């Protein structure tokens, strides 16, 4: 077994104070997302999406956030994928944005609900054509014999859709994650990190500081 106990560093980039927090957590998320983009982080919209199967086994994967507003967080996926099947069984979901260079992370707990076909189609048509074709090619999470089979299918579908628009696959869609809570974590000196959690109420958000 490899001993990794000596890998550590101090967090020095600043703290997070209650007096500076906005009432709406999405305002703080927007600010942090913009700062992650301004810092030119690699894939600032990348988030770890956790779902649970019918046996209670959790699964995680990296997915790109495509939109957010006061309603929540939006991502798109193959509806035959493992994550989509798990969401159909249990809509509870967790998102994590790991912005390590900024010594920050944001954790979201909530429920996922399917997007309308209009919203899905609108986003699908905005994708590069090769990405649209790739959506037709991959039966996500299924076992394949070799990469060559995937590449061959891509070439076949690229020829099929060479002219005109690529239609929206029936098995492709998206989700809105409506947050029940959003936790903001900022690294602090001596491991005295700052953690604030926003919890949704019927009318507003409660804000609490958590011990690091």
From Swiss-Prot:
Record's keyword annotation contains Membrane: no
Family assignment from sequence similarity: Belongs to the pyridoxamine 5'-phosphate oxidase family.
Enzyme Commission number(s) of this protein: 1.4.3.5
Cofactor: binding comment: Binds 1 FMN per subunit.
Known partners and oligomeric status: Homodimer.
Protein name in the entry: Pyridoxine/pyridoxamine 5'-phosphate oxidase
Binding site for FMN: 61-66, 76-77, 82-83, 105, 140-141, 185, 195
Cofactor entry: FMN
Alphabetized Gene3D superfamilies for the sequence: Electron Transport, Fmn-binding Protein, Chain A
Function noted in UniProt: Catalyzes the oxidation of either pyridoxine 5'-phosphate (PNP) or pyridoxamine 5'-phosphate (PMP) into pyridoxal 5'-phosphate (PLP).
Positions bound to substrate: 8-11, 66, 123, 127, 131, 191-193
Record's keyword terms, sorted: Flavoprotein, FMN, Oxidoreductase, Pyridoxine biosynthesis
Coiled-coil ranges per UniProt: none
GO process terms (BP): pyridoxine biosynthetic process
